[in-house]
Amino acid sequence: MKIDLSTAVGLVAGIIIISIGIVGNSGELYWFINGISLLVVLGGTLSATLVNYSIKSLLGLYPVLKNVFTHESYEYQSVIEEIVKKAKIARKSGVVSLEKELNTIDDNFLRNGIELAINERDSKRLRTFLALEIDNIERRHASGQEIFFYMGAYAPAFGMLGTIMGLIIMMENFGGAQIGMQIDAINFNIAEKFAGLLQGMGLALITTFYGVLFSNLVFLPIGGKLKRKSQEEIMVRNIIVEGIMSIHAKEHPILIHEKLMTFVQESKRPNKD
């Protein structure tokens, strides 16, 4: 398992590009740093997620996040070759002969599937077991993806909420104190008040900035990456299922190879001489 540099590079590149956009428009980076705004967005997003999910589900995000920053290569060709190799043995000596080959199989799903094929004579029951395993894998993957997609939806909402809060506070401070229906005489420098108003508006909008930033640079992209990786893994699992069913049916290894290669994109298939 290798480190997936694209995730880290994408995050860093996004921050750099946004920073260039700020500085390039005669802005200062420190204008966009506000702890309270950050607390409202991240704290609010986490709180809403806790309402939607259990603490156990959120604590289970660590291995999911680890998967985002690691790259597990799914080599379709090597999986197909492994299946064809086992198919040759099964066709020559029977499916039961694969029992002594189980320790040589690295992929847990393939190893468990072949073990099921050895012990289960009914092909329909075998396919049902394997399909159930794939469904459970998809369900586990979807749970992690869903959390990040929801967080991507919550973050802008709390960003807007923080902005509204800031505007309300700013207007109250600008308008002065009001008791009942009596309004005290206003005695202030209008220029200073207007400058304070603009400054307060800028601070209020920072919360929206944080909400949009975390949603579109962190939460939604992570959810999308998890979904893409899940699709790749499920593709390999489907190849394995079809291979195991073909071995169980004692199909010819050449036919098995040709059938399984239909799962692979034509551009990734080896050239035939």
What name fits each language-model region?
Residues 2-10, 16-147, 232-273:
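Large intracellular
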